[in-house]
């Protein structure tokens, strides 16, 4: 069975579970919990769910996500062991030398029209914007900084879409109780409910996104970490973690 068929089967099963047993998410320890989280996250992006309901659901989903990860033997990784999120690159640079984290009036539940820039942009060496490293002629891989469960993915983005982040992946870091957000990807190799370990490839750097695709946009990874405060994702500055992990690959 192809990956797309597997994902579709899991998704349809999740819809049945949610319709028949809405409270099961509190106890589920299967990949379905990732699919269910993805469904809520999609509704948050499109503002088709009440904020209070969304907050409560994310809070409920955390425990079973952690239980599923540990049941399946996921590799727990402490923060000081996080892995730099890019591999197979010749050189990189940080937007504004790493001073681009701006919280502003950001709120996770603003949907796709979030304000501020509570994350960091890592540019790759791609002057001609063909999505390939100018020195190697190959794509730059995006890998998971920590270990956890994929809880939200978008592979449907097309030019003209209003989705600000383009193609993205969100992974709930079980050990550090937070969500990693990787966006503007050109390709994605994971799906909701999948367990990923630190250093595992999840995608390739790209220029997808409402503004990034424009002529002035640069090929880069937009990455954020949102700590869970009782289920509420709160952005956290982590440039020191990025620089520390980068040193490990030099």
Positions of PLM-derived features:
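Bacterial N-terminal signal peptides that target proteins for export
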Residues: 1-10
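Bacterial N-terminal signal peptides
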Residues: 9-19
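Polar/charged, compositionally biased leader and regulatory segments
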Residues: 24-141, 241-250
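Small beta-barrel nucleic-acid-binding modules, principally OB-folds
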Residues: 120-134, 178, 183-185, 225-235
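A generic structural motif
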Residues: 126, 154, 175, 186-189, ...
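Zn2+-dependent peptidoglycan hydrolase active-site motif and core
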Residues: 136-139, 143-186, 216-220
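Short, well-structured beta-strand-loop connectors
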Residues: 141-153, 190-205
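Conserved, short, structured surface segments that act as functional micro-motifs
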Residues: 162-171, 194-250
